[in-house]
Structure formats: structure tokens, C-alpha cells
């Protein structure tokens, strides 16, 4: 599996690369931190590991650029003890977040969980779902409503798929977290909240503001 490791600390880059390669990850680095996108497009990685603090442009900037062209999963690394970094990364479309210093085994567990849910997760063979007056194309991570189309991240689409398949029923937070992150012991409860809020903002763009209801203390429900 190809990994793009966007990390300017060469000591950490070398240590991480050696550890990840023992787990059959093929690690690619950045030659020019002024042009991360060229390397991203040439490698076409399965997952991006993105440091927050980088030369010239930070990891948030490059995440925005990547999200303009791709839904490739992104895991953030940060040495800053700032909860807003985690919130910002999730709002930009990151899939997970690890604060430095970290246990390498935790990082590997997160990478493996991301790979399973993004590339192997499927509730059944049907790839198109009808919901209210919209069509979910699961293969393209898109929603079509009348003449409007929006695109979701892999995480957002999995959440919505699970909710839509249980329309008018509560899907618990624990059920969603377990399906999305197999290593849920390492996941902040806020991570799911941020992803659901981001999904709601996108649905609002196609006039589906109240399509997902929060059931306080329980979970979420998609109205049919």
C-alpha cells in the first residue's frame, strides 16, 4: 500500500518510514514542500499522513488542495497541543488525527483501520441508494438531487449509508464509531460529531437541512 508521508522532520520521517515498511507500507516522501500536489498526483497514495507544521504552507493548506481533487484518506500528525487543530483537520476532511509524541503501534492501528473502512467496507453489493428525493451513488461518494450534485468524503458517505439503510431508526454513536474506526479505543467521541456536522453542512447545500436528526444520548436518525 502506497503512503505519502508529508513530514519535514527528516529524523522522524526516517524512523516512521522504517517502522511502516515493516508492515508492508510503501512510504513516499516530499522532495519539494512548495509543491506537495505534484508528488501527491504522481504517487496516487492509498493514504496521506500529513504533518500540520510544514515549511511555507501548513498541512491545512495542502489538505484543502488535496480535497479539491481527491477523497484520498488523510491522517494528520501534530506536535501542537491545541484541540482546535484536531477540529480544523476534521472540518477540512481529514479522516483521523494523531498528536506527537505518539506510539507507533497506535499510528499503525489507525492506518490499518482507515484502509479497512475506506477500501474494504461495504454493507452490501448495492451501490446506489434512493433517499427522500436524492440518489446516493456509493461508488462515487456523491449525492444527486434534481440538478445538484455534492461529493462526500469516504467517512461521510459511510455514515450516511448506514443511516439511510436504517431510515427512521436510531443508529447509535457506538455502532457508527465501531464501523468507522476498528480501533475505537483511540478515537475521540468528538471525531464522530465533527464528521456528522460536516455531513450536515453539505446536505444543507442541497436543501436537506433537517434530513439527519440527533437523538441526544443515543445517536442519529435519517428521516425517510
UniProtKB/Swiss-Prot annotation:
It is found in: Cytoplasm. It comes from Staphylococcus saprophyticus subsp. saprophyticus (strain ATCC 15305 / DSM 20229 / NCIMB 8711 / NCTC 7292 / S-41). GO terms for cellular component: cytosol; protein-DNA complex. One of its GO terms (biological process) is response to antibiotic. SUPFAM superfamilies: C-terminal effector domain of the bipartite response regulators, CheY-like. Member of the two-component regulatory system GraR/GraS involved in resistance against cationic antimicrobial peptides (CAMPs). One of its GO terms (molecular function) is phosphorelay response regulator activity. Keywords: Activator, Antibiotic resistance, Cytoplasm, DNA-binding, Phosphoprotein, Repressor, Transcription, Transcription regulation, Two-component regulatory system, Virulence. PANTHER family: REGULATOR OF RPOS (PTHR48111), SENSORY TRANSDUCTION PROTEIN BCER (PTHR48111:SF27). This is Response regulator protein GraR.
Amino acid at each position: 500500500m502506497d503512503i505519502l508521508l508529508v513530514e519535514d522532520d527528516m529524523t522522524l520521517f526516517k524512523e516512521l518510514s522504517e517502522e511502516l515498511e515493516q508492515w508492508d507500507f510503501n512510504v513516499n516522501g516530499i522532495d519539494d514542500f512548495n509543491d506537495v500536489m505534484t508528488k501527491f498526483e504522481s504517487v496516487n497514495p492509498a493514504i496521506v499522513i500529513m504533518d500540520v507544521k510544514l515549511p511555507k504552507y501548513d498541512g491545512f493548506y495542502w489538505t484543502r488542495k488535496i480535497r479539491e481533487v481527491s477523497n484520498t484518506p488523510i491522517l494528520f500528525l501534530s506536535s501542537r497541543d491545541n484541540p482546535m487543530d484536531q477540529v480544523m483537520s476534521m472540518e477540512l476532511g481529514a479522516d483521523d488525527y494523531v498528536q506527537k509524541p505518539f506510539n507507533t503501534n497506535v499510528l499503525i492501528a489507525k492506518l490499518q483501520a482507515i484502509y479497512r473502512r475506506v477500501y474494504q467496507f461495504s454493507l452490501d453489493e448495492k451501490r446506489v441508494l434512493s433517499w427522500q428525493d436524492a440518489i446516493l451513488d456509493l461508488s462515487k461518494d456523491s449525492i444527486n438531487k434534481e440538478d445538484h450534485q455534492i461529493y462526500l468524503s469516504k467517512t461521510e458517505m459511510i455514515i450516511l449509508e448506514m443511516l439511510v439503510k436504517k431510515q427512521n431508526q436510531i443508529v447509535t454513536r457506538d455502532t457508527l464509531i465501531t464501523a468507522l474506526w476498528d480501533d475505537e479505543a483511540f478515537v475521540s467521541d468528538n471525531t464522530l460529531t465533527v464528521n456528522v456536522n460536516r455531513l450536515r453542512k453539505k446536505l444543507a447545500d442541497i436543501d436537506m437541512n433537517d434530513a439527519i436528526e440527533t437523538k441526544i444520548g443515543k445517536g442519529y436518525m435519517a428521516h425517510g
